[in-house]
Amino acid sequence: MTPIFLQRSLVEELKALFVDFYSTDDISKTPPKVNVYQQDLPIALGSEEDETVPYIIVRIDSGNIPELNEQERVEVILVFCIKANNENRQGYLDVMNMIQRVKERFFKNFSVGKYFYFEPPFEWAVQDEDTFPYFYGAVKMNFYCPGIMLEDPLL
């Protein structure tokens, strides 16, 4: 199973995980649809930019296979974005809630899809730059994919 299958599994998992997510900025109390994208945002045409927010990007960052017949470790970065228009600038709370939701999910159950599993560390950060009304955060996680087994009869 390739890192791309891992990425697809994570996209589906995160869509399900955030189906009932509420923003602290939303006075209507209707959950906004959290968009989940593979690797990057789609190209925005015209005024479509705000339609992507809130979003999560599932980005494959790097990977390695330390030795023959071993599992592949894939580093994945999740990027979170929320738009919060309120004057108290509390959009970071939504970002932190999203990070917490992901953390709880993967520390309670390491597996995702049929073939992949998370292994700590779990690293997170929030943006310190002022990008009001947009608030950002990120998570770095390691996942393991099944290894490729050597089939050479000469070895």
Where are the regions that the model predicts?
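Short intrinsically disordered coil segments
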Residues: R73-E75, L93-N97, P153-L155
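Small/polar-rich, solvent-exposed N-terminal microdomains that initiate assembly or binding
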Residues: M1-L68, L154-L155
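Short histidine-centered catalytic/ligand-binding loop motif
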Residues: C81-V95
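Active-site-adjacent structural patch at catalytic or cofactor/ligand-binding sites
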Residues: V58-N85
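Short, hydrophobic/π-rich interface segment
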Residues: Y92-G113
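A short hydrophobic beta-strand element
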Residues: P54-I56, V76, G137-F143
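Glycine-rich loops and low-complexity Gly/Arg-rich segments
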Residues: F80-N85, R101-F106, C145
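Short, charged interaction patches at domain edges and termini
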Residues: M1-A16, D61-Q71, V112-L155
